[in-house]
């Protein structure tokens, strides 16, 4: 198999198998020229990427990544594609911290912002976290603190090969959806937001081809998160089975609120909201939005039998101080962590623009 033959086949309308797509990704990262990469990406876009092709490219991207193997399970990631319609508070990042407070081991994959005001790396950097930590340090953090952050450019250096072709093409390609599928810690469970409701089923069926045990793929009426302003389109992946459904805020025991009530701002403003939500001083719609998404992470980890029960556990993690303790650990505030033994015990009881998740918050 060579890249030119693959481009020709895809241009003629042929679909690649998972294994063929995985090999095509290897060729992209190791051998292909920028012209060949651009031709393949454009051909896939014109044909329409299949679930098998997305899964194969994701596995090929994982093959090329710097990976870690923390001795914690089930590892959970809360990572979206970015590219949605709203600049909200940093949802997936805050939700990950709250879920960690509920005892869920978190391997958070993220990046700096591309087009939104504040990506996951932007807000965590402002808060004091070492967002560019090397793989061994992140592995240790997950094992010791129950939460670690993996910056996409640090863990996916092979993605440099596609920077030029993607910029020149100037359109969305298969790589716009791959970041959340390529967790370098091999997360067992995920809450994965997508920018287009039509992608929910496609990405869920792609995950069913991959070694992920339990996942929720969601689109919340314009958000790549579970929303509280309207119903969320969702697909649950349990092994190789996929179930599509909708989530209403009322199903989670939460009130609806207009999208404007959860608007974000600069990284500094979003970091202040993050801190306030995890320490309990920020309430109302912003807290509820985080509870919805943290509850989903707790659910896919197998800690609860329902999403609504996950929301209740998320609220307990905030109210007990456990979420604030995890935030302090992520930001390297050892004094705060050591000073809150009760909250800490909850865990034991229970080139950035193209390298991975884009605008994930």
Swiss-Prot record:
An example Gene Ontology biological process: L-tryptophan biosynthetic process
Cofactor annotation: Mg(2+)
InterPro entries reported for this sequence: Anthranilate_Pribosyl_Tfrase, Glycosyl_Trfase_fam3, Glycosyl_Trfase_fam3_N_dom, Glycosyl_Trfase_fam3_N_dom_sf, Nuc_phospho_transferase
Chain sites annotated for binding anthranilate 1: 80, 111
One cellular component term from this protein's GO annotations in UniProt: cytosol
Top-level EC class as recorded in UniProt: transferase
Function field: Catalyzes the transfer of the phosphoribosyl group of 5-phosphorylribose-1-pyrophosphate (PRPP) to anthranilate to yield N-(5'-phosphoribosyl)-anthranilate (PRA).
Name under which the protein is recorded: Anthranilate phosphoribosyltransferase
């Amino acid at each position: 198999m060579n890249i030119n033959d693959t481009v020709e086949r895809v241009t003629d309308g042929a679909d690649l198998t998972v294994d063929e797509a995985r090999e095509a990704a290897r060729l992209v990262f190791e051998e292909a020229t920028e012209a060949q990469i651009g031709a393949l990406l454009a051909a896939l876009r014109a044909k329409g990427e299949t679930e098998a092709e997305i899964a194969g490219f994701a596995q090929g991207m994982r093959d090329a990544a710097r990976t870690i193997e923390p001795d914690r399970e089930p590892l959970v990631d809360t990572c979206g594609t970015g590219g949605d319609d709203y600049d909200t508070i940093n949802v997936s990042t805050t939700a990950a911290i709250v879920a960690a407070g509920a005892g869920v081991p978190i391997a958070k994959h993220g990046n700096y912002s591309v087009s939104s005001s504040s990506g996951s790396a932007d807000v965590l950097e402002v808060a004091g976290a070492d967002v560019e930590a090397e793989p061994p340090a992140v592995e240790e953090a997950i094992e010791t603190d129950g939460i670690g952050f993996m910056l996409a450019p640090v863990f996916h250096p092979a993605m440099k090969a596609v920077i030029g072709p993607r910029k020149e093409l100037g359109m969305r390609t298969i790589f716009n959806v791959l970041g959340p599928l390529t967790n370098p810690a091999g997360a067992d469970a995920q809450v994965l937001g997508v920018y287009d409701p039509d992608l929910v089923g496609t990405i869920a069926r792609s995950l069913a081809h991959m070694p992920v045990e339990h996942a929720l793929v969601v689109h919340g009426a314009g958000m790549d998160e579970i929303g509280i302003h309207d119903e969320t389109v969702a697909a649950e992946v349990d092994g190789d089975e996929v179930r599509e459904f909708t989530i209403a805020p009322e199903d989670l025991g939460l009130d609806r609120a207009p999208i404007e009530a959860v608007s974000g701002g600069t990284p500094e403003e979003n970091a202040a909201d993050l801190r306030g939500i995890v320490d309990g001083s920020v309430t109302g719609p912003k807290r509820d939005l985080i509870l919805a998404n943290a509850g989903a992470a707790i659910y896919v980890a197998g800690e609860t039998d329902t999403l609504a029960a996950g929301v209740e556990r998320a609220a307990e993690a905030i109210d007990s101080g456990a979420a604030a303790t995890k935030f302090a650990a992520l930001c390297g505030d050892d004094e705060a962590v050591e000073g809150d033994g009760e909250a800490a015990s909850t865990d034991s009881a229970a080139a950035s623009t193209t390298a991975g998740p884009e605008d994930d918050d």
